[in-house]
Amino acid sequence: MPLIIVEGSRKSGKTYLVQNQDVYPVFKFPFNEVFSKWNPGRESKDTHWMGLGKEIMLHELYNQSQLKEETLIVDRGILTNSVWGVFQKRIPLEQAIDDLIKFSEMGLLDNVIFLRIEGTWNESREKDIWDGDDVRIGEERHLFTQFSSLLQDLGHKVVVYPNHFDGESLKRFILTLKNI
């Protein structure tokens, strides 16, 4: 069974789509809570390593059949860690690319499907400590596109899903999941 990782920039509707489907169970690492508790720093390399460590553990558990019993959806994953590593100046672009290549070479992305959500909710919101970065969504989106292309070049499946923030988008999302 595949591991489905739902990725995309802030305000693309990822979490809404994931929470409103009942096809597969969902795992969402409580990054904001963990970050706030330990507070390694927004631009700290430690923040990148914390996220990367979580990703390595998740993918190793999956590869060792601990999680392969059924399809699992992960709300944000290795692409987000790489994008935000560069976006928040925690790591250089070259390191993010190298991290993704290493993940691929280690087989950590075998039988993984990336579902990258595209769309932007234009309403203002107060969600978390990262709200101030919403003005840079274009930059974030560019990095998601760049890293998704790299994963495709490495032979991994990336499905781009347009979210129009309507009931039809949710229906199509559920149908997409059922067809994976």
Predicted regions and their residues:
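Pre-Walker A (Motif I) flank of P-loop NTPase domains
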Residues: 1-3
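Hydrophobic anchor at the beta1->P-loop junction of P-loop NTPases
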Residues: 6
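The conserved Walker
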Residues: 10
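Conserved glycine(s) of the Walker
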Residues: 13
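Conserved substrate/cofactor phosphate-moiety recognition/catalytic segment
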Residues: 16-66
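Glycine-rich phosphate-binding loop used to anchor ATP phosphates in small-molecule kinases
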Residues: 48-107
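A glycine- and Lys/Arg-enriched "phosphate-lid" helix/loop adjacent to the NTP-binding pocket
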Residues: 88-147
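NTP-dependent small-molecule kinase module
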Residues: 131-180
